[in-house]
Swiss-Prot record:
Membrane topology note: Multi-pass membrane protein
One Gene Ontology cellular component: pore complex
Name used for this protein in its record: Outer membrane protein U
Domain of life: Bacteria
InterPro entries recorded: Gram-neg_bact_OMP (IPR050298), Gram_neg_porin_domain (IPR033900), Porin_dom_sf (IPR023614)
Keywords: Cell outer membrane, Ion transport, Membrane, Porin, Signal, Transmembrane, Transmembrane beta strand, Transport
Task performed by this protein: Forms pores that allow passive diffusion of small molecules across the outer membrane.
GO biological process, alphabetically ordered: monoatomic ion transport
Presence of the UniProt keyword tRNA-binding in the record: no
Main location class: membrane
CDD domains, per database record: gram_neg_porins
Taxonomy of the source species: Bacteria, Pseudomonadati, Pseudomonadota, Gammaproteobacteria, Vibrionales
Amino acid sequence: MNKTLIALAVSAAAVATGAYADGINQSGDKAGSTVYSAKGTSLEVGGRAEARLSLKDGKAQDNSRVRLNFLGKAEINDSLYGVGFYEGEFTTNDQGKNASNNSLDNRYTYAGIGGTYGEVTYGKNDGALGVITDFTDIMSYHGNTAAEKIAVADRVDNMLAYKGQFGDLGVKASYRFADRNAVDAMGNVVTETNAAKYSDNGEDGYSLSAIYTFGDTGFNVGAGYADQDDQNEYMLAASYRMENLYFAGLFTDGELAKDVDYTGYELAAGYKLGQAAFTATYNNAETAKKTSADNFAIDATYYFKPNFRSYISYQFNLLDSDKASKVASEDELAIGLRYDF
């Protein structure tokens, strides 16, 4: 693939991965390795293997996972390329048995076309608000509990998505189609053999976002909006990067269901020192006029190699145990090892 197309692909990826916090953002994925490249066609393979031990109230749980992804690109001409991407996540929690109930989550499955004016894809992909929550979602394990995204703004299937980078301005937009259902004369979902007509589930919606980088000042701002059925929300975010220091804040407001108001805000800070990185976040949210999230988390990450790290993360749960259940108000300690490939 020629240099023009590579530059286009890199700039588009920067919009999607929150590159403005590179080196401090511990939650993102690393770029994969090119395993094939010839005659304008390339294939990258990437992912992670992550061992995660969670401790709450002295009780342990295995939250380990493996992600594997494939990114294929084909040059059509000097300003146009085709792209396909798949990522799956495998998790296991056997509860001390040789169980067969492990799960595979198809996180991404999409294909599309890109060029000078951005990239358009269809399939299971991110909505437009993920790049806004990336401002404060910078920790190795905890964080991002107060900026809840409605389904159409998150990672979902049956979605037509666009992303583009125009100088210092990055934009994203997505539209999710309602899912077709076969129904009988009474409107009940049935097999197509017994159906009288087609209907849909009413889960269509859209999301929009934009991020602007103020040159080399280290200052970035972002805004986004999403709407789906009886749900809607908007988000505003800002960040400042000064060498090895990073600060960010996010505010969100909307309705998670009809007459169910939701308001949240997140604050994040990070510091990189040699091969170590330290991050902290505060999250607070209110759902239906009741506090649904209130926590402070801090973690430390050490890179033995660029693709191998260890981390320890602790979340102080500030929810009142008299108003929330004992389980919902517990603190959490997490210890992890992560290998990126």
